[in-house]
Structures are given as structure tokens and as C-alpha cells.
Amino acid sequence: MPLSSARAAAFDILLRVERESSYASELLHADTYNRLSDQDHALTMELVMGVLRWRSRLDAEIAPASSQPLSKLDVEILIALRLALYQFRWLDRIPKRAALHESVELVKRARKRSAAPFVNAVLRKLSTAAPQSTPEPDSAEAIASTLAHPAWLVERWIHHYGLAAAAEICRHNQRIPPTTIRLRSPTAESELNAQGIKLKPGSLLASARRVLSGDITTTRAFRQADIVIQDEASQLVAILIGRAQGEVRILDCCAAPGGKTLAIADQNPTAEITAVEIHPHRARLLQNLVSGSKHNIGTVVADATNLPFTSPYHRILADVPCSGTGTLSRNPEIKWRLKPEDLSDLHTRQRAILRSALAQLSPDGRLVYSTCSLEKEENEDVVEEILAQDNSIHLLDCRSELDLLKNAGDLVWPVPASLTRGPYLRTIPGIQPCDGFFAAILEKDS
């Protein structure tokens, strides 16, 4: 029996995620795997994301069936075991014997032939064993165990958001996230409908649509950037920049892959926009996206902690690199990589970027500081530290800006204030139907 292309691809991707700290979502859309048939690509994605989402639950079940501690197993062996067990427990349509056989073959293919009998024995035990019972998620320990999250993260979320919200965040992270797009052309929606793409209106923004069925990546609208794949919270953060009057200069400090840059440009079509990205390969992705637009967007490869510009900007977006804990439904590997001490390192860099960006801001200018993190160290703590050190900067209450967006028809969420915590924008996955984002609006005195 030939080895399944989908399982081989899933194994390879999971191995790269472990060894190279790659992101599964990026690998799944690499040319190598895009050559798979639609059916095989869908199964590959299901296997990869399922194993990453439920990793700790899988390991907790594998451990008692293994004669060796999991920490002693080669990564290839552990990945093969996780792949098979995920299929046993979550993919009823796949016969257990097929999943077992293919994981044994994957180990042989990975040049671990001597481990094949061990893998076979462990999986035979697991294939006949009843699934482990899981506790109701009514405590930090139970949420972490049942919903497969690190306990330290769950404990933080309970502290900051409450037990019920923490459980909802974790439930949300374990679901397949929807594909959401931003419409950039007045004809894009009707064009997609004519091609059999089914859409429904977004929950937060008038420009957003959720894709119910169909492959938008094959459409002319996608190729021409008449639509952009972008979560609604990400869209909302970008338009907090506001519609500036007259000829203005706008800076996007950490711009790749470019969705927010385009949203800002669409809102400010006459602006001169500079999009900065530190990594050359990501800057190329950014350039490819914005090059087809009619906007005046220049891309610059530079470090946002030391911006090289001499003329000030009227509007700045500082969407800084962060832990990404608001996007775990899309990037589940993050929860297994992140360590508590990482938050301090991120805080230091984020503070440096915000300082550098504020130095570029003109008097009476506006800066939006944002992350896709749920962690206080990366959000309020960064902003409040800067405010305490610079009397020329003040905080604008996000609620007033959301009310303006609501009155203009851009925001369709019924209760704008529910998107805030104090003066800050805060979306919570599972509480709102979007990723978790934070934003603060800062203004410089004249």
C-alpha cells in the first residue's frame, strides 16, 4: 500500500515545526504542499492543525501506553504516534488500521526503521483502548488538561479575564477558525457570488465577509487584491488610524504581510504611506501585495526600533511583533513554544519600537499601538510605561473612536463599548467572533 501523500506531508510539516520553529500555516501554503490535490491538502491541514491543537491531550494518552518516557523518544517517533492517535480519536472516517499502518511506514521513511515495532505496539494498544476521560473545564488545571493548553497560560487568562472567559478562549482556540476577507472593490462580492463563493456579512465591520464555502484563492478578485484575507479584529485595528484630512504622511512600522497597510491606504487614498519591514523576505511579500494598488505606498527594509526617517508622520501604526496569544486558533504551535520569560523580552522590544515610532510622530499626530496578544505585559504595560515617561503624549479613549466608526457605518458590532477594556480596544477570542487584539490610540500634543 503506497504511503498517503496527505499523511507524508503532515508528518514533514510537523517535523519542520518542531525542528525549525516554522509556522504550520505558512508551510501549508508553501508551493511544495500547494501541489497536493484539494482533498489531500484538506486532510494535511486537518492532521497538522489537529495534532498541534491537541498535542498535550495526545501526549497524555500516549505516555501510559509507551514503555519509554516521551522525553526520550526521537521527535520523528513522537510525531508518528501523535498523528495516528489524532486520527483514532478525532477522525472517525479513517479506519484505525490505515492510520496505524501509515504511521509505522512514516517512521521507516524517516530512517527510524528499528523503532517501527515499538510504534506498532504502542498504536495497537491505543487503537483498542477507550479514550481517556477528561474533567469538566471548571478550574485552571481542568481547562489546561481538557482543552490542551499550557497551565501557566490558562492561569494568566483566569487572572486577567476570569475563569469563564479563559475557558471560552481555550475552546475558541481548539476550533477551526473561519476565513474572513475584507472587500476592497464594490464589485468583489457579486463577482465572488457569481463564481459560487458563498459569503456572509462580518460581525464587526461593514467591509468584512466570512467565507462559508468555495476557494477564494483561485479567484480573480483574490489575485488582483480586490479582496484581502484578514481577520475582523485586524481590520478594525488598522482603521483606528482614522481618515486624515488633506495631504498626509502615514507610517506603518511593522507592516508585513501588508493587510493593515492596504486598509490604511484605502481609508486614506491621497496619503503618502511608508511601510517598514525588518525582514527582507517579508518585505518582498509586502511589496507584492501593495504593488498592484493605486496608492502611494513605499516599502522600506529597516529596524522599527531605530527608524531612519527625518520628516515626521501625521499618522503611525505600530503593530508590533508579539507573542500572538490572540491567534492560537490559527497558530496553535505558539502555545507550546512560548515561555513566561519570553514576555519580558517581548516587552523590551515593543517598548523600543513604540519609543522609536513616537519620535517620528508630528505634533497633533496620532499613533495606534497594537498587538495580537492577550498579555498585559505586551499591551497596557508598554503603553502606560511610555505615558509615564513622556508628558507630550496622551491617550485617546478608544470608545470615542469606535462610536465615530459606528456612526459612519464602518462598525456594525451592536455594542462598541464591549470591544474595550478601559480606554483600550480589546477583543477576546471566544467572547467576540474574531482573533484577540489590543490597541491603544496615542496622540502628541501640539
Regions found by a protein language model. Name each.
Residues M1-S446:
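S-adenosylmethionine
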